[in-house]
Amino acid sequence: MLLRNGKILSYLNLTLTAAIWGFAFVAQRSGLESLDPFTFNALRFALGTLCVWLVRKVARPGDAPARTDCGTTFTRKGIRQLLLLGLLLFCASSLQQTGMLWTSAGSAGFITGLYVVFVPLISLLRGRKLSKALLVSIPLAVMGLWLLNKDVGLNANLGNGLVLLGAVFWALHIQLIDRLTQLHSSLDIAVVQYAVCTLLSALVAFPVSRAVPAWNMDLAELLQGIGQATVPILYAGVLSVGVAFTLQLHAQKKTAPEVASVILCLEGVFAMLGGYLILGEEVSLMAATGAVLLLAAMLATILGEGRGHFLIDKKGKPKF
């Protein structure tokens, strides 16, 4: 079994995405100290939209759809799907960011990573068959996530419930990306979904900030809050949105969503690593064991995908 260079690059892109997202949980939690969830998301996705739009202006022709028979124009159906992708991104990011008001970054990281379960469940509903490698790696990943976050103190509270619902939307988002990256360039998809998420976040931020006294700020207070959250906004906007989400889009052109979800849940490992390197947090033996299991799940998935057991229907054709 020999993996092609394109596959290897996709795996590296997904791993880098997981690393950026892992460190982003701390940034997102810090941003909530100064801004409400929707204003924070509106600002970071606006920044991400701007970054990707600028890159798109100078992008090389290599940023093309995975399929060569679909052209470059947007159909009405394609536009509706892109708008739906932006809506899913808005729902997922809003639920996650709002949930973090009542839960820790560690809890949010663990619960969000449960999309590794939801993605293959959705695939089964779509009529796909999971390979033996995935049947092994998914339980490994769940066990690894649990061990990695065993000490965070999960409770059945509102915050964890919102983040869990967000994980379902993240799974739907990953699944729809699987289809759209076959039909459109990753930069086109990125600009549209980020812009939609920015607009929806801004539209919700205004009435919500007026309804919640703690978030009701005048212009001077808002500018002060933005100033205090500058670093989290820059990290979450430029790196988490502009770089990581776009890398995910590019990588999923050649990677099945089930495989992508296993690799992306490595964000929990990088969150732990960031806490150790930056915040000086201790890493328990249990957490280290969880990290090893997550790495094992990723390797099992990658080796299994090399056998070509994904994205094939009963007639042997690609299934979208």
Q: Residues of each region from the PLM?
A:
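C-terminal-most transmembrane helix of multi-pass membrane proteins
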Residues: 3, 45-46, 53-54, 58, ...
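Helix-helix packing/entry segments at the starts of transmembrane helices
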Residues: 18, 43, 108-114, 177-199, ...
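Specific transmembrane alpha-helical segments of multi-pass solute transporters/efflux pumps
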Residues: 24-25, 53-112, 147, 237-255
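Specific alpha-helical transmembrane segments that line the substrate/conduction pathway
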Residues: 39-50, 97-128, 132, 166, ...
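Hydrophobic transmembrane alpha-helices of multi-pass small-molecule transport proteins
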Residues: 52, 130-150, 167-170, 201, ...
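Hydrophobic alpha-helical transmembrane segments of multi-pass integral membrane proteins
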Residues: 8-13, 39-54, 58, 134-140, ...
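Loop-to-transmembrane-helix transition segments
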Residues: 9-17, 65-96, 158-166, 215-243, ...
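Glycine-/small-residue-enriched transmembrane alpha-helix faces in small-molecule transporters
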Residues: 1-42, 87, 91, 95, ...
